[in-house]
Amino acid sequence: MRILGIDPGTRITGYGLIEKIGNRLLHVDNGAIYTRTDAPLADRLKTIYDGLSRVIADYAPTGVAVERIFVAKNALSALKLGHARGVAMLAGVNASLPVAEYTAVEVKQAVVGYGRAAKPQVQQMVRVLLNLPEIAQEDASDALAVAICHAHCFHLNDLLT
């Protein structure tokens, strides 16, 4: 199973691809899609959609996992993040891929074993679990964590059904 994890954002959208073979998780690729902060929101969303569509076409994942929105203090930021999430989900659905969503607490629990883990702990565990030489760029590391969460949760759902 090849999983595309996405950490959506209107400024930077991180992506991470992993391959689950048996009980092993293998790193395939990771990166970030950057948008121009001075560009209109619609143009930024198109940049995100086009970038994720290219990643999907290049790597042919079998599923997509997206970080679910959190409750934000700034309503405008939350709305913009919601737009980025929608575009990320649309890229997956338009490629006929199943799309799953996970909260930050679920991701941290799956990766570190503690739902309130600090970001550096999550980044370090992603590095260890995927045998990376160094910690990935922050948004890409978050996306890899979402993909790892999906790999673990998908396996658990398989066992339960």
Curated annotation (Swiss-Prot):
Family statement drawn from the similarity comment of this UniProt entry: Belongs to the RuvC family.
Active site per UniProt: 7, 67, 139
Any Pfam family the entry gives: RuvC
Subunit (UniProt): Homodimer which binds Holliday junction (HJ) DNA. The HJ becomes 2-fold symmetrical on binding to RuvC with unstacked arms; it has a different conformation from HJ DNA in complex with RuvA. In the full resolvosome a probable DNA-RuvA(4)-RuvB(12)-RuvC(2) complex forms which resolves the HJ.
Protein name: Crossover junction endodeoxyribonuclease RuvC
Key word DNA-binding present: yes
The protein's required cofactors: Mg(2+)
UniProt key word Metal-binding: yes
Record's subcellular location: Cytoplasm
Comment on bound cofactor: Binds 2 Mg(2+) ion per subunit.
Enzyme class: hydrolase
Residues bound to Mg(2+) 1: 7, 139
GO molecular function: crossover junction DNA endonuclease activity; DNA binding; magnesium ion binding
InterPro entries (UniProt xref): RNaseH-like_sf (IPR012337), RNaseH_sf (IPR036397), X-over_junc_endoDNase_Mg_BS (IPR020563), X-over_junc_endoDNase_RuvC (IPR002176)
Signal peptide: none
GO CC terms in record: cytoplasm; Holliday junction resolvase complex
Listed PROSITE patterns: RUVC
Function description: The RuvA-RuvB-RuvC complex processes Holliday junction (HJ) DNA during genetic recombination and DNA repair. Endonuclease that resolves HJ intermediates. Cleaves cruciform DNA by making single-stranded nicks across the HJ at symmetrical positions within the homologous arms, yielding a 5'-phosphate and a 3'-hydroxyl group; requires a central core of homology in the junction. The consensus cleavage sequence is 5'-(A/T)TT(C/G)-3'. Cleavage occurs on the 3'-side of the TT dinucleotide at the point of strand exchange.
Catalytic function, reaction form: Endonucleolytic cleavage at a junction such as a reciprocal single-stranded crossover between two homologous DNA duplexes (Holliday junction)
Gene3D superfamilies: Ribonuclease H-like superfamily/Ribonuclease H
